[in-house]
């Protein structure tokens, strides 16, 4: 029973941190004192569940990474058409950001500006994994469909991910007014016409 309470408290702390990142407080540095107040516990209680604030952010980053990479792997398993795979991965990233504005502050790096450099490195590694997945999709086109792209797959993967990152940054910069998935079908029609 005590184990469940500890797990629930850890989840409660992470949920509160994500909510604070989504609110106006997320636009500035979040302190453990503010977080403890939000959760309704002492700062010491926070540290019974997490050894540092960096570990709290790592908990959210792990959730982001697991959520995105497991779904990207599912797209690999279920979809075989290259352009559909790319579209689905891009939609996944944009929809995840839209549903989780607080976590998008982490993905954009905004919430990590004054935090441990290790956290920014973790986000960079996540984006590198996503870019590698996009590159793999692009390279498999030649094997699956006997076609290649008009530009190098490395450049194309970087461009696709850059488009997503730009949408995420715009979402954060606008205080979540410009939804990342807005007009995606029109945007995709323009993008896919260029890469066919």
Swiss-Prot record:
A GO MF term: transcription cis-regulatory region binding
Gene name, Swiss-Prot/TrEMBL? slmA
- Domain called HTH tetR-type: residue spans: 7-68
**Protein source organism:** Vibrio cholerae serotype O1 (strain ATCC 39315 / El Tor Inaba N16961)
**DNA-binding region per UniProt:** 31-50
Main localization of the protein described in the UniProt heading = cytoplasm
Compartments where located: Cytoplasm, Nucleoid
What name is this protein filed under? Nucleoid occlusion factor SlmA
Instruction: Spell out the family assignment given in the record's similarity comment.
Output: Belongs to the nucleoid occlusion factor SlmA family.
Subunit structure of this chain's protein:
Homodimer. Interacts with FtsZ.
Superkingdom of the source species? Bacteria
């Amino acid at each position: 029973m005590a184990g469940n309470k500890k797990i629930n408290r850890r989840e409660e702390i992470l949920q509160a941190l994500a909510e604070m990142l989504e609110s106006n407080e997320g636009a500035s540095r979040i302190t453990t004192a503010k977080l403890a107040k939000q959760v309704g516990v002492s700062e010491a209680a926070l540290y019974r569940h997490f050894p540092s604030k960096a570990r709290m952010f790592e908990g959210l980053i792990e959730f982001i990474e697991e959520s995105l990479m497991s779904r990207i792997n599912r797209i690999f398993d279920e979809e075989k058409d290259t352009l559909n795979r790319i579209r689905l991965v891009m939609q996944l990233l944009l929809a995840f950001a839209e549903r989780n504005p607080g976590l998008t502050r982490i993905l954009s790096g905004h919430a990590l500006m004054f935090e441990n450099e290790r956290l920014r490195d973790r986000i960079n590694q996540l984006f590198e994994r996503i870019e590698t997945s996009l590159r793999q999709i692009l390279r498999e086109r030649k094997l699956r469909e006997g076609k290649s792209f008009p530009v190098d797959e490395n450049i194309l993967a970087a461009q696709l991910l850059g488009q997503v990152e730009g949408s995420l940054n715009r979402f954060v910069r606008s205080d979540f007014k410009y939804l990342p998935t807005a007009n995606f079908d029109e945007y995709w029609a323009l993008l896919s016409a260029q890469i066919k």
